[in-house]
């Protein structure tokens, strides 16, 4: 736990971020690191219209295909319209393959509680491939990951078995530690 917030200057997106770290854990057996805390984003100021446009463009690029974008799209049942596809990752004879899904929402047992505006999902499979088709992988990512596809972005999300994930309208989801990316 941090007594003072960590201060991050993100010149690329035009934000000063103060992050109050609540917990930081590393499991040496699984090699999984988790942390939690509270971020405070403050927009940088600029009198340059060109700089403001540059920041807004960079923010849109960072948002597109992000976990926040995905969760908001899932909540609104707009995965396909927003450029997402999900597939289940299954292991067969020590080989992983992707299983295309006809019904994204049925496969994750999507349910909306209108009284509290919460969506719950409980995927039928623990490993879910999230494909974002509306943006190609960046050249830097492809350089570091030569086996990756250049035509789309791919992330694999691991869900805890038989645990549901709650999603709020703003894209916040919990329990945060119930998934690993």
Regions found by a protein language model. Give the residues of each.
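Surface-exposed, low-complexity/disordered segments
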Residues: 1-181
